[in-house]
């Protein structure tokens, strides 16, 4: 009989406040211990590190989840780190907007229980004369009261505000406070941290998040970028967009692929890159500028100095026809090489590039040979080669190109057979020539070596296909 214990699910213990990264200050930890707060709730464990790391947050948090401390503790930590510490009496460093006076009073009570003697926390429902005389560094109130106070009280200084919190954001909008909330946001500095806490994530909350967050972005996996690009084009088919690609080969490939998608047939595409002749580039740019809608596909040849009116989006990325297959391979290899050699290595991190997923996003059927990629990395998680396809059977739609390909294919096969039979033996003169070639190769410049390597890679890919 098997005496091994049954499978059990081991739940990870919630972290303590002293274990959070980046760490909270020692005196904050001591104040929490005195108040009986030692272990984080899930909301606190997820939210506090983000806010303390200069990130905006949108949090799905119900009542009783510990969200009040989740935004109060980062505020305290942020103020202590700021250049304005200690703040002046009327220097407002944080604003917390809540839907009701009762909730504002509750937040104020928690803030007074855990705050340190570094700032004045004030509920705006308090006596205005007291507020004017003593000032406040953290304001907590309803949208109506806060917006009215901001209009009338010029003595409060919001220029160095560090954090804005919207508590119960869904209720704020349901109760008709959107106008006041928008006014408050418009009066505050854009360089701040913003936190939206809501029990439900409605479309109105999402719209408010877009308005309140600064420099927003969505993280997209490498194998999903192509589908997200198509989605963006469909959603904005009557507008003007610019899509930047890493290399000229990428422009050629994606220009060919997306123009054949049925749902994008009504969109005009204008490809341009540095390997096109000047007349072709000028024609593409002029046509795109004059068009009422369309998509400009380009490399950095169009990154500077162009003034094209009406552009809504600028996007950077990062049919059974052999032309698509070969252009896809060339585009993928050129992207990988350009990514590795990019000067901005902090952003274009070679070690962090998910090559397998990237290949899936490019529609690669079988992983090609790339000199920059070690062979043991080809089996990276995320790439699944297509089975049951003979690549030699994929033909060009263009009959003349297909005829030439067949001739080249036969020539390569004959060459390989001759090499296998040993009919091609090097003479002593050829050996000397090879030695001279190796000597000359060592004297080549980096660009020359790269050109030779590219040609060799393309030859290798042709042999594999």
UniProtKB/Swiss-Prot annotation:
Residues 413-465 are annotated as: Disordered. Its EC number is 3.6.4.13. It comes from the Eukaryota. Residues 456-465 have a biased composition (Acidic residues). Keywords: ATP-binding, Helicase, Hydrolase, Nucleotide-binding, RNA-binding. A motif (Q motif) lies at residues 17-45. SUPFAM superfamilies: P-loop containing nucleoside triphosphate hydrolases. Residues 428-437 have a biased composition (Basic and acidic residues). Residues 48-219 form the Helicase ATP-binding domain. ATP binds at residues 61-68. GO terms for molecular function: ATP binding; ATP hydrolysis activity; poly(U) RNA binding; RNA helicase activity. It is an enzyme of class 3 (hydrolase). A motif (DEAD box) lies at residues 167-170. It catalyses: ATP + H2O = ADP + phosphate + H(+). Residues 228-422 form the Helicase C-terminal domain. The Q motif is unique to and characteristic of the DEAD box family of RNA helicases and controls ATP binding and hydrolysis. Belongs to the DEAD box helicase family. DDX55/SPB4 subfamily. This is DEAD-box ATP-dependent RNA helicase 55. It comes from Arabidopsis thaliana (Mouse-ear cress).
């Amino acid at each position: 009989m098997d005496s091994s214990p049954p499978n059990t699910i081991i739940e990870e213990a919630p972290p303590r406040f002293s274990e959070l990264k980046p760490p909270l200050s020692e005196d904050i930890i001591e104040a929490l211990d005195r108040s009986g707060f030692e272990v984080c709730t899930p909301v606190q464990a997820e939210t506090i590190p983000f806010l303390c790391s200069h990130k905006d947050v949108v949090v799905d948090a119900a009542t009783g989840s510990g969200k009040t401390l989740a935004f109060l503790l980062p505020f305290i930590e942020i103020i202590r780190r700021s250049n304005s510490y200690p703040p002046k009496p009327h220097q407002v460093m944080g604003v917390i907007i809540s839907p009701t006076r009762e909730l504002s009073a509750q937040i104020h009570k928690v803030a007074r229980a855990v705050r340190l003697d570094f700032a004045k926390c004030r509920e705006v429902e308090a006596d205005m004369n007291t507020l004017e005389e003593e000032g406040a560094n953290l304001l907590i109130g309803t949208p109506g009261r806060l917006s009215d106070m901001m209009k009338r009280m010029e003595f409060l200084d919001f220029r160095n505000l560090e954090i804005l919190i919207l508590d119960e954001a869904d209720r704020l909008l349901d109760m008709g406070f959107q106008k006041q909330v928008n006014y408050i946001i418009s009066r505050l500095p854009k360089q701040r941290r913003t936190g939206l806490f809501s029990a439900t994530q409605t479309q109105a909350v999402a719209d408010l998040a877009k308005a309140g967050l600064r420099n927003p972005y969505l993280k997209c996996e490498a194998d999903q970028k192509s589908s997200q690009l198509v989605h963006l084009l469909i959603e904005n088919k009557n507008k003007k967009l610019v899509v930047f690609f890493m290399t000229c080969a990428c422009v050629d490939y994606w220009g060919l692929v997306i123009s054949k998608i049925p749902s994008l047939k009504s969109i005009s595409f204008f490809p341009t890159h540095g390997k096109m002749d000047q007349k072709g580039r000028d024609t593409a740019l002029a046509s795109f500028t004059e068009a009422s809608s369309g998509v400009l596909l380009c490399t950095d040849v169009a990154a500077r100095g162009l003034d094209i009116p009406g552009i809504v989006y600028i996007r950077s990325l990062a049919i059974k026809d052999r032309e698509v297959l070969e252009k896809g391979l060339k585009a993928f290899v050129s992207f990988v090489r350009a990514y590795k050699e990019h000067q901005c290595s902090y952003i274009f991190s070679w070690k962090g590039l998910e090559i397998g997923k990237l290949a899936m996003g490019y529609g690669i059927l079988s992983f090609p040979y790339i000199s920059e990629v070690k062979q043991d990395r080809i089996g990276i998680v995320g790439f699944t080669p297509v089975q049951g396809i003979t690549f030699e059977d994929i033909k060009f739609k263009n009959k003349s190109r297909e005829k030439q390909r067949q001739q080249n294919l036969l020539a390569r096969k004959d060459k390989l057979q001759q090499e296998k039979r040993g009919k091609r033996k090097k003479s002593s003169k050829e050996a000397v020539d090879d030695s001279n070639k190796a000597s000359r190769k060592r004297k080549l410049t980096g660009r020359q070596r790269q050109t030779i390597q590219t040609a060799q890679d393309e030859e290798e890919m042709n042999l594999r296909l």
